[in-house]
Amino acid sequence: MMQDKQGEPNSFRSPDAVNRIDWALKAKNRDLFDYVRGLIALRKAHPAFRIPTAEGLQQGLHFLDTGDSGVIAYTLGEYANGDAWKEILVAYNGNRQQAEFHIPEADWTVVCRDGRIDPGSRDHMPG
């Protein structure tokens, strides 16, 4: 993560000087490190993010029309893969600016926002 390969697009045959892990980048990018660590913990805590079969995904995964090619949003529903959460909405904005789109009606609990993860969040967003 955040590895500097010195511009080498395919470092498979490059020496260790190119492929080594620069641990100083972890400290420099601490916010990103903590965010990814939180995402991993969220994935481990919720079976819905670990659906093992294509059939399971087809049953529970529904993509939303965001009207923006830079925004991906989907729901995982009906306690997917035995999850404790009835329905999960995931939205990722790959744009530099804010995006707006309609989400399904529900009282959503916001667990992840602006690079911060709080599984015990009490922040809500109506759909």
Each predicted region: which residue ranges?
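Carbohydrate-interacting/catalytic domains
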Residues: 1-127
